[in-house]
């Protein structure tokens, strides 16, 4: 099997389509216009998917999958992931080597395999037409006899034996993969030959049209450094050359070109190769000609070839742009530095930037959020989890303006729930973190609640679907932990357990004693879990005193610790920041706070087993939940705060009064025979959209004021949302609360007020004489229907026209007033932003000098210090550097508050990047590299929130990343050695 077309089960994952199922198909490499692409074909048919590979490969991984089979996994720059399984190991290895060569930009246009280069030729065919090649070959035959007389036939025989082998099209005797067999013969002369390309443009065009057999024969002879041509018969020296010989050959070629004796000098330089061509072998190497691989000497066909065709000019231009292997490349560090860009400060939003950078650095958290196939189009546009994920995906690949816009959307999503974050005043980073995590959990709960009840067509018999349909909440699997509080009666020993879930722990600063060294985060954590006495009435014995112990019942992957760096001054009624020095250890241990029943953190594979990876079908990518005729319509649980806003405008109070008046007048014209019966029907059918006839024939005159108001609201709500016929039941409705755009910046749907698709009951029996149908829309943009068959038709129309004119006048006045209020509000907001920014800068500058605090600080006055034995203290000290104790956690991020007061200052974040295996400081938009020791020493007085990852989870992630990088490095070395 050709290594450039491999077959097996294929799975694709991307942000647009989610994760697809395994389907039989093939990967095929196609080269076109100096670009290499991967074409995915499925055996079931359909349109092939094409992925560009040139400058787009992020990682290539090959893993064993059964006996003599492998799985090839390809990651692109946009985090798209392609896998093909059950591929023969040999073919998979050759494909991997080729992809790595493309990844490392070591497969330029001038060196791509052609039809004669082994097994790659069937796919990356030649660019020269067969007709042109045949013309070249026939020309070579005609010229061979004329040149034999002047050539040295002594060296011709062994060379012809090597190149005349019919099997030379794929030189299978050379060790290595398909790439190693093809590229070495081209790279040996690429460097000196490039210098001759800029000398004579006409000559280069003509040299391009020479045959592939001429080119292949020129390479060994040009590198010949002996008179008896030993290099032609020695395989180990066949593709090696002396740099000095190349330079001499190049110099001689330039002298020949300037002397004008091109045909004669060319023939004497290359010996008798032209006369010894065997076209039976040369015919299998079509279009091996390329500008970057041409020799600098003039070709023998100078006076006989026709004028260059446009195809040759096009080829020349493409290859001339490529400068070859020795082109100075931009160092990898510069690319990383370009990607390392922080978040813009929108106006005192440093607290948000610091928290987001710390959360985004949690690799397991990001994987659980992005890689389980969450149907983003099912989630409302303004939901935090959607805004959060969009920013996480785009933060390293979009420009600063787009990133700033995404940041605003994240802030607005949180401000919609917590108004204290809506302005531009300073806020506490821990409060923002708590709000963010709680809101993400709520969004996931709402998604799972809707997802469980939604039917999925065509998946009833699928073995991949388990009984529980649920997506994994990244907050629960990574950050949430459970603590069991045991209340023990000191009189009778009765134990009352109570469990509580936390996303983080707020720990106190221990009171510092002068002779002792500074306390550490470990001390504060142990202080939190110490046993304490409290007054408690025992139900069993009536005792009044109890002891409370706290133990971990379930551990998190990442433990977040919030250090209370503030104290309340009762006299001044102010919160003061505590600048006490606190040692930040590399490792923490929770072993003394765990029991034998304590559950370990969720493993990294837990999410994949528990979450249902449901591929997004075309029907699931619309902008709303689909309403099925066989099942009731389900409302998405993300609802608006005010249900009245669904059908009424903000200034619709007068309209409501008029609707009530019209309804009362209508009741006087209606009969009273079926009023009670219709009222009962209306109360029974309240979950379903009632008929117009039922609502309008209801006994309005017998209703109370509240009941009448509710009935009129029901009519207005029904008329405000357009109903669909039975023919449109299968068509989804568009809504901003249920749509997911591909880039979150799209046009709003047509019906923004429609929350769900409602089907009106079919009206089977209507008596035009018994009632009059009145329809009034809330937006007042539609024409009102006039009643038919009523006695007061003329009076009603006149009164309605007068009311309509009055309403229009009131609407204009309200609109003008609203615009004035909006302008005033915007002006006030701008003033608040400027004032807050100036105040923040002033307070920050005034407090920066005192940011380090004082050694006189003694921590919180009501908190005692922990007492350890000498052995315990020594053990904790060793564990702080090694993490050898059970249940140890490793420091991965610190959020620091710079400033002397708790009401003002600036937040920064230090995070450990597992992929780069280095620490970085994020100061809003600025990013800088920092050493871990500097983080521990520089943040000992300003560290506010600390992120610690479970050591086993950290080691597993780090090992996976190292293996991935070492695999790429090995592949690069192997490829370079082969070249």
Curated annotation (Swiss-Prot):
Compositional bias segments (type: Low complexity): 183-198
Chain location of the short sequence motif KEN box 2 per the record: 221-223
Motif (KEN box 3): 782-784
Reactions catalysed, as given in the entry: Thiol-dependent hydrolysis of ester, thioester, amide, peptide and isopeptide bonds formed by the C-terminal Gly of ubiquitin (a 76-residue protein attached to proteins as an intracellular targeting signal)
The keyword Lipoprotein appears for this protein: no
Entry similarity comment: Belongs to the peptidase C19 family.
UniProt function note: Deubiquitinase that plays a role in different processes including cell cycle regulation, DNA replication or DNA damage response. Antagonizes the anaphase-promoting complex (APC/C) during G1/S transition by mediating deubiquitination of cyclin-A (CCNA1 and CCNA2), thereby promoting S phase entry. Specifically mediates deubiquitination of 'Lys-11'-linked polyubiquitin chains, a specific ubiquitin-linkage type mediated by the APC/C complex. Phosphorylation at Ser-628 during G1/S phase maximizes the deubiquitinase activity, leading to prevent degradation of cyclin-A (CCNA1 and CCNA2).
Protein name: Ubiquitin carboxyl-terminal hydrolase 37
Species this protein is from: Homo sapiens
Phylogenetic lineage: Eukaryota, Metazoa, Chordata, Craniata, Vertebrata
Gene name tied to this protein: USP37
């Amino acid at each position: 099997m050709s290594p450039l077309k491999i077959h097996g089960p294929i799975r694709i994952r991307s942000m647009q389509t989610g994760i697809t199922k395994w389907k039989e198909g093939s990967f095929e490499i196609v080269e076109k216009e100096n670009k290499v692409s991967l074409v995915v074909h499925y055996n079931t048919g359909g349109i092939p998917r094409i992925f560009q590979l040139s400058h787009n490969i992020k990682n290539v991984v090959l893993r064993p999958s059964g006996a003599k089979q492998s799985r090839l996994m390809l990651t692109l720059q946009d985090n798209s992931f392609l896998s093909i399984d059950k591929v023969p190991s040999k073919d998979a290895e050759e494909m991997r080597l080729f992809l790595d060569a493309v990844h490392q930009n070591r497969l330029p246009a001038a060196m791509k395999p052609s039809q004669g280069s082994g097994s790659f030729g069937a796919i990356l065919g030649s660019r020269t037409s067969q007709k042109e090649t045949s013309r070249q070959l026939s020309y070579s035959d005609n010229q061979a006899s004329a040149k034999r007389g002047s050539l040295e036939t002594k060296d011709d025989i062994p060379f012809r034996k090597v190149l005349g082998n019919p099997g030379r099209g794929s030189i299978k005797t050379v060790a290595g993969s398909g790439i190693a067999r093809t590229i070495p013969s081209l790279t040996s002369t690429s460097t000196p030959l490039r210098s001759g390309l800029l000398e004579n443009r006409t000559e280069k065009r003509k040299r391009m049209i020479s045959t592939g057999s001429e080119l292949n024969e020129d390479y060994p002879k040009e590198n010949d450094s002996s008179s008896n041509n030993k290099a032609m018969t020695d395989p180990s020296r066949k593709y090696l050359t002396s740099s000095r010989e190349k330079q001499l050959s190049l110099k001689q070629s330039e002298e020949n070109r300037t002397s004008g004796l091109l045909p004669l000098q060319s023939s004497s330089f290359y010996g008798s190769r032209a006369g010894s061509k065997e076209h039976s072998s040369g015919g299998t190497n079509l279009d091996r000609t390329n500008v970057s691989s041409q020799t600098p000497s003039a070709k023998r066909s100078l006076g006989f070839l026709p004028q260059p065709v446009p195809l040759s000019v096009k080829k020349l231009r493409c290859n001339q742009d490529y400068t070859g292997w020795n082109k100075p490349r931009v160092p990898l560090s510069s690319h990383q530095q370009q990607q390392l860009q922080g978040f813009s400060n929108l106006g005192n939003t440093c607290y948000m930037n610091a928290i987001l950078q710390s959360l985004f650095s949690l690799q397991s958290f990001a994987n659980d959020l992005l890689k389980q196939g969450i149907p983003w189009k099912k989630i409302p546009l303004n939901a935090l989890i959607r805004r959060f994920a969009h920013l996480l995906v785009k933060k390293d690949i979009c420009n600063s303006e787009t990133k700033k816009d995404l940041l605003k959307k994240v802030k607005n999503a949180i401000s919609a729930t917590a108004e204290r974050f809506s302005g531009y005043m300073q806020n506490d980073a821990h409060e923002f973190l708590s709000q963010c995590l709680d809101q993400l959990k709520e969004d996931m709960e709402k998604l799972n609640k809707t997802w469980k009840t939604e039917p999925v067509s065509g998946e009833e018999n699928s073995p991949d679907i388990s009984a529980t349909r649920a997506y994994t909440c990244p907050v629960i699997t990574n950050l949430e932990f459970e603590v069991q509080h045991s209340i023990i009666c000191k009189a009778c020993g009765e134990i009352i357990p109570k469990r509580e879930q936390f996303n983080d722990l707020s720990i106190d600063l221990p009171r510092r004693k002068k002779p002792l060294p500074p306390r550490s985060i470990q001390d504060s954590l142990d202080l939190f879990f110490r046993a304490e006495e409290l007054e408690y009435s025992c139900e069993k014995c009536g005792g009044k005193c109890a002891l409370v112990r706290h133990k971990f019942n379930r551990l998190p992957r990442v433990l977040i610790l919030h250090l209370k760096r503030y104290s309340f001054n009762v006299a001044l009624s102010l919160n003061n920041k505590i600048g006490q020095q606190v040692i930040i250890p590399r490792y923490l241990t929770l072993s003394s706070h765990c029991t034998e029943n304590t559950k370990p953190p969720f493993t990294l594979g837990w999410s994949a087993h528990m979450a249902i990876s449901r591929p997004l079908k075309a029907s699931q990518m619309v902008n709303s939940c689909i309403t099925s005729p066989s099942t009731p319509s389900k409302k998405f649980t993300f609802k608006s705060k005010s249900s009245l806003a669904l059908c009424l405008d903000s200034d619709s109070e007068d309209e409501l009064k008029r609707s009530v008046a019209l309804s009362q007048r209508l009741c006087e014209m209606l009969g009273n025979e079926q009023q009670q019966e219709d009222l009962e029907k209306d109360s029974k059918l309240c979950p379903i959209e009632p008929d117009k006839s039922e609502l309008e024939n209801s006994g309005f005159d017998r209703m109370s004021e509240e009941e009448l108001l509710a009935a009129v609201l029901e009519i207005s709500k029904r008329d405000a949302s357009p109903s669909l016929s039975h023919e449109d039941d299968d068509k989804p409705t568009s809504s901003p609360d249920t749509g997911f755009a591909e880039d979150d910046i799209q046009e709003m749907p047509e019906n923004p007020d429609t929350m769900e698709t409602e089907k009106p009951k079919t009206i089977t029996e209507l008596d035009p004489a018994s009632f009059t149908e009145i329809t009034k829309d809330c937006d007042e943009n539609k024409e009102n229907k006039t009643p038919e068959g009523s006695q007061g038709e003329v009076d009603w129309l006149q009164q309605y026209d007068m009311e309509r004119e009055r309403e229009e006048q009131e609407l204009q006045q309200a609109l003008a007033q609203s615009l004035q209020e909006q302008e005033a509000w915007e002006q006030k907001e701008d003033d608040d932003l400027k004032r807050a920014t100036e105040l923040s800068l002033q307070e920050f500058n005034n407090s920066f000098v005192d940011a380090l605090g004082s050694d006189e600080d003694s921590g919180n006055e009501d908190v005692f210090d922990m007492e350890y034995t000498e052995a315990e203290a020594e053990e904790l000290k060793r564990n702080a550097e090694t993490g050898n104790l059970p249940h140890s956690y490793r420091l991965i991020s610190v959020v620091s508050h710079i400033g002397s007061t708790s009401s003002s200052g600036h937040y920064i974040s230090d995070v450990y990047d597992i992929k780069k295996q280095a620490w970085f400081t994020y100061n809003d938009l600025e990013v800088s590299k920092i050493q871990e020791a500097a983080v521990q020493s520089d943040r000992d007085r300003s560290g506010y929130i600390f992120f610690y990852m479970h050591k086993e989870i950290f080691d597993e992630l780090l090992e996976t990343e190292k293996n991935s990088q070492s695999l790429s490095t090995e592949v690069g070395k192997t490829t370079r050695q082969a070249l």
